[in-house]
Amino acid sequence: MSANGPSHPARELKAGGSLSGHVKVPGDKSISHRSLLFGAIAEGTTTIDGLLPAEDPISTAACLRAMGVLISPIEAAGLVTVEGVGLDGLQEPAEILDCGNSGTTMRLMLGLLAGRAGRHFVLDGDASLRRRPMRRVGQPLASMGADVRGRDGGNLAPLAVQGQSLRGTVIGTPVASAQVKSALLLAALTADGTTTVIEPAQSRDHSERMLRAFGADLQVGGEMGRHITVRPGNTLKGQQVVVPGDISSAAFWLVAGALVPGADLTIENVGLNPTRTGILEVLEQMNAQIEVLNRRDVAGEPVGDLRITHGPLQPFSIGEEIMPRLVDEVPILSVAACFCDGESRISGASELRVKETDRLAVMARQLKAMGAEIEEHEDGMTIHGGRPLKGAALDSETDHRVAMSLAVASLLASGDSTLQRSDAAAVSYPSFWDDLDRLRC
C-alpha cells in the first residue's frame, strides 16, 4: 500500500524500554534497482538474491515488464530472475510507465529509454513524484541528443521520451548525484561514441561496479574517481547478483542502539561500500560504540556486520563534502543530534528539500512537536541537543525515512507518541515495525 493511498489508523509508539538482538535489514535499494535494470538489458538470465521486496524496486520491475522484460515475482526471501532482452530489445509500451513514488525509477528510466530510437515512452508517478525535479537528468541527456519533454520545461512529470540516436560526449554534472550519473551511463551504453561523465564530487558507485561486472567497457579515473568513461559496443551478459543489506536502513538501528539505554544490537550483512559509509564516519565523530565485524566481499561489494551499543554521544557537524555519502541518513542523524549535549550542525543538505518530501522542513517540524530546539536553514539545520523530548502526535508526511526516524525518537521520549501514515516505511523497509517489536526488551 502506498503511503499516499488510503489512510491507516495512527500507530501507537510506546516510549521506554531497551533494544537487544540481531537484525537483518532489507536488501540495498540502490543495488536492487540497478540489478533489475542491468539484467533487463543484458543477454541471458540474471538471478538476484536479496532484492528489496519493497514498493520502489517493484515500480522499476513493473516498468520493465511493461516493455517486454520477463521478471519473476518479487517476494520476501525469494530469488528473482530477469530474462534479459539485450541492449536494444525494450519494446514500446502500450501504457504509461508508472514509477510510483520512486525518483530513482524515473530518473534511471530517462537514461535507459532516451536512446531507444523510434520508440515513444511516457513516465508518470504519484503526487509526490510529480513534484520532484527531473531536469537535472533531462538537461545533460539533451546534450547527447535526447528528447525529454514535460511540465515546467521538462522538469516535472508526466514526462514524454521520444527515443533518439544518441551521441557520445563529455558531460559535467552540476551536482554529485548517483541517479544523474547512472542515467547518463545507461544512455552511454547505446550512444554513438565514447561518453565521459565528470562529477563535482564522488557519489555512490554501485552503477560503475555493477556495469563492469555485467561486461560494460567502463573506466573510472580522475581525482577521487570522478571521471567515468563508457565506450559502447560491449554486450552485457546476465549475472548472479547478491544484494547486501541497505546501510541506509541499518542507520535507524545504529542510531537507536547508540541512543537507547542498555541497547546492544548487531545488524548483519550490511553493505559497506565506501561511497555509502558516511553514517559510520559521523557516528565515530560522535564517539558511538560501534564495531565492524566479519568484513568480507560479496559479489564485488564490501559487506560486514555492525554491532552498536549504548553510550554518550558528542555533537557533530557535517557539510557538503560528506553529504553524497550520507544524504539519506540526515533525518535519523537529526534525531541523534537531539540527544547530544550541545549544538550539532547539518549544512550542504539542500538536496533534501526535493526528496519524497522536504525532509529538512518535515524533520524540523515533527521534532519540534516533541520539544526539540531546531533552527532550520536553507541548506540544513542547527540542533540544540540535550533537551528532553516528550511524546507527541506525529506524522510521517508520507516519507519512509521520516517515519522510521520518528519511531527512533519516540523510544527516547518522556511519554508515548502516535504516528500518522506509519505505513510509509514500506517504501524501503517493509518489515521495519515487525523488527522494532522483536528487538524491544
Swiss-Prot record:
Pathway: Metabolic intermediate biosynthesis; chorismate biosynthesis; chorismate from D-erythrose 4-phosphate and phosphoenolpyruvate: step 6/7
Compartment annotation: Cytoplasm
GO molecular function: 3-phosphoshikimate 1-carboxyvinyltransferase activity
Superkingdom of origin organism: Bacteria
Residues annotated for phosphoenolpyruvate binding in this entry: K29, G103, R132, Q179, R359, R401
Positions of the catalytic residues: D328
Catalytic reaction equation(s): 3-phosphoshikimate + phosphoenolpyruvate = 5-O-(1-carboxyvinyl)-3-phosphoshikimate + phosphate
Record keywords, A-Z: Amino-acid biosynthesis, Aromatic amino acid biosynthesis, Cytoplasm, Transferase
Pfam families: EPSP_synthase
Primary location: cytoplasm
Binding site for 3-phosphoshikimate: K29, S30, R34, S177, Q179, D328, K355
Gene3D superfamilies (UniProt xref): Enolpyruvate transferase domain
GO BP terms, alphabetized: amino acid biosynthetic process; aromatic amino acid family biosynthetic process; chorismate biosynthetic process
Region spans: Disordered: 1-21
Entry's Gene Ontology cellular component terms: cytoplasm
InterPro entries (UniProt xref): Enolpyruvate_Tfrase_dom, Enolpyruvate_Tfrase_sf, EPSP_synthase, EPSP_synthase_CS, RNA3'P_cycl/enolpyr_Trfase_a/b
EC number(s) given by UniProt: 2.5.1.19
Name of the top EC class for this enzyme: transferase
Keyword Chaperone: no
Record's function text: Catalyzes the transfer of the enolpyruvyl moiety of phosphoenolpyruvate (PEP) to the 5-hydroxyl of shikimate-3-phosphate (S3P) to produce enolpyruvyl shikimate-3-phosphate and inorganic phosphate.
Family: Belongs to the EPSP synthase family.
Complex formation: Monomer.
HAMAP family in the cross-refs: EPSP_synth (MF_00210)
UniProt xrefs under NCBIfam families: aroA
Name of the protein described by the UniProt record: 3-phosphoshikimate 1-carboxyvinyltransferase
Higher taxonomy: Bacteria, Bacillati, Cyanobacteriota, Cyanophyceae, Synechococcales
